[in-house]
């Protein structure tokens, strides 16, 4: 098992049609994860459908319907190796209605490549995805200023886009001077694996060099076990196989685990019989591992996506109510107490009611600006009380940060994002 190299989950984010899937396809090709003959086959198929430049993107968009529509829907996991790490790519969809996939996808990422097309520059989703990455705790970014071939590798335009992106990064607390900006053409392979003659003015790293230079994520093995469930399968002859990513802690064969809240809100316990990753059985699973595990002692209809698996002696927290700090990213009017949008936290999606707005904060100092304001609006940071309409596992961001973040969606868009400060447990 290639577990000898450290593992990094990589999100690829950015506006639609800026070249995310093509970049991922190119990375897989350049690192030998996808054989050349498969790319050839895709190329022929793409040309026959009149989409000649799409062959690299097709590696990721292997769902038939997506190929026809030319967009990425579900989050595709693919793996590739560099000298130093092995990566699982979480290819995050860029279409507006898929931002919630982006939320569950990015919350699994240790680092992200933000793809911004040079001809267009910063678009709505470019901003949204940078905001979300920050809220969801992605601290390592690489910026690919892509489609440089479409602007004849013009340095002036590259610098303009770099400045546009830097402005947004600064606004939310990233330091642009510590982030690599790379002029790329994913389609042509410019500055992906090797330095390109087309950009003699650029002396920085390639995408692969930037990936190798990422810091290894610290594995939160000492925290309690938490595995948010993505899917639950029943496999004949084996039984119940939940699938998810270990966020914190360690899971071993023989562990007694509990899934909360469960369909009926009471939680269900069982025993781990085996654990698989990349179709190979492993003795234990660590944070960052995407696993399927066989559990005995639980009926199949009792657990579902959005439940969280933990050890019986340190169970996941089900919240009756929680206090959170939120940032309103975009809302057409004002948000008042009683507002009930959908909260996306790890793999769960639950409608929650904002019961009280306790205070607004001054974004510069973090201090209280106003106590008990009547409403909050776009751009505001606030402390609020929230009550889920059905049982939801969520943790304090100070205790288990991976499960202490959430995004709020309404009207097909991400309205706000936030972190959990305190919980009234069930």
From Swiss-Prot:
Quote the InterPro entries the UniProt record gives. EFTu-like_2, G_TR_CS, GTP-eEF1A_C, P-loop_NTPase, Small_GTP-bd, T_Tr_GTP-bd_dom, TRAFAC_GTPase_members, Transl_B-barrel_sf
Q: What class of enzyme is it?
A: hydrolase
Which residue ranges are recorded for the region named G5? 185-187
Give the Enzyme Commission number.
Answer: 3.6.5.3
- Chief subcellular location: cytoplasm
Q: Does the keyword Thylakoid apply?
A: no
From which domain of life does this come? Answer: Archaea
Keywords of the record, alphabetical order, are:
Cytoplasm, Elongation factor, GTP-binding, Hydrolase, Magnesium, Metal-binding, Nucleotide-binding, Protein biosynthesis
| Binding residues for Mg(2+) | 21
The UniProt annotation puts the region (G4) at 146-149
Binding residues annotated for GTP, in chain numbering: 14-21, 91-95, 146-149
Which Gene3D superfamilies does this chain map to?
A: P-loop containing nucleotide triphosphate hydrolases, Translation factors
Cellular localization per UniProt: Cytoplasm
What residue spans carry the region label G1? 14-21
Residue span(s) of domain tr-type G: 5-221
Write out the catalysed reaction.
GTP + H2O = GDP + phosphate + H(+)
Citing just one GO molecular function, the answer is: GTP binding
Give the region (G3) as residue ranges.
Answer: 91-94
- Output the Gene Ontology cellular-component terms: cytoplasm
Which residue ranges are recorded for the region named G2? 70-74
The family classification in the record reads: Belongs to the TRAFAC class translation factor GTPase superfamily. Classic translation factor GTPase family. EF-Tu/EF-1A subfamily.
What the entry lists under PANTHER family is as follows: TRANSLATION FACTOR
Function (record text): GTP hydrolase that promotes the GTP-dependent binding of aminoacyl-tRNA to the A-site of ribosomes during protein biosynthesis.
What NCBIfam families does this protein's entry cite? EF-1_alpha, PRK12317.1, small_GTP
Protein name listed in UniProt: Elongation factor 1-alpha
Q: What is the lineage of its organism?
A: Archaea, Methanobacteriati, Methanobacteriota, Stenosarchaea group, Methanomicrobia
């Amino acid at each position: 098992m290639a577990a000898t190299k450290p593992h990094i989950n990589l999100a690829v984010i950015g506006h639609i049609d800026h070249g995310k899937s093509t970049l991922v396809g190119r990375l897989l090709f350049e690192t030998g994860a996808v054989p050349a003959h498969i790319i050839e086959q895709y190329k022929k198929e793409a040309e026959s459908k009149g989409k000649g430049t799409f062959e690299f993107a097709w590696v990721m968009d292997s769902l038939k319907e997506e190929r026809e529509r030319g967009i990425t829907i579900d989050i595709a996991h693919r793996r590739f190796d560099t000298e130093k790490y092995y990566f699982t790519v979480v290819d995050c969809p860029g279409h507006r209605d898929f931002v919630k996939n982006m939320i569950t996808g990015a919350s699994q990422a240790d680092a992200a490549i933000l793809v911004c097309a040079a001809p267009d520059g910063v678009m709505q989703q470019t901003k949204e995805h940078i905001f979300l990455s920050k809220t969801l705790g992605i601290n390592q970014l690489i910026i690919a200023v892509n489609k440089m071939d479409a602007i004849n590798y013009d340095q002036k335009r590259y610098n303009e886009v770099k400045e546009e992106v830097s402005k947004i990064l600064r606004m939310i607390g990233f330091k642009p001077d510590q982030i690599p900006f790379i002029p790329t053409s994913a389609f042509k392979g410019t500055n992906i694996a090797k330095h390109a003659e087309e950009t003699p003015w650029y002396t920085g790293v390639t995408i692969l060099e930037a990936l190798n230079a990422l810091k290894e994520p610290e594995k939160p093995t000492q925290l309690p076990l938490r595995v948010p469930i993505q899917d639950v399968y029943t496999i004949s002859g084996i039984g119940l196989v939940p699938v998810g990513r270990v966020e914190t802690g360690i899971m071993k064969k023989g562990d007694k685990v509990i899934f909360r809240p469960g369909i009926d809100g009471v939680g269900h316990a069982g025993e781990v019989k085996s654990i698989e990753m990349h179709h190979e059985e492993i003795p234990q699973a660590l944070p960052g591992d995407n696993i399927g595990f066989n559990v005995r002692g639980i009926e199949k209809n009792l657990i579902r996506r959005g439940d969280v698996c933990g050890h019986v002696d340190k169970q996941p927290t089900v919240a009756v109510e929680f206090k959170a700090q939120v940032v309103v990213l975009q809302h057409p009017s004002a948000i008042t107490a009683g507002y009930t949008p959908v909260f996306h936290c790890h793999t769960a999606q639950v409608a929650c009611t904002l019961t009280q707005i306790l205070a607004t904060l001054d974004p510069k100092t973090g201090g209280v600006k106003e106590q008990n304001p009547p409403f909050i609006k776009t751009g505001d940071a606030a402390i609020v009380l929230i009550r889920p309409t059905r049982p939801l596992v969520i943790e304090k961001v100070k205790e288990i940060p991976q499960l202490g973040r959430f995004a709020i969606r309404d009207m097909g868009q991400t309205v706000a994002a936030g972190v959990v400060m305190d919980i009234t447990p069930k």
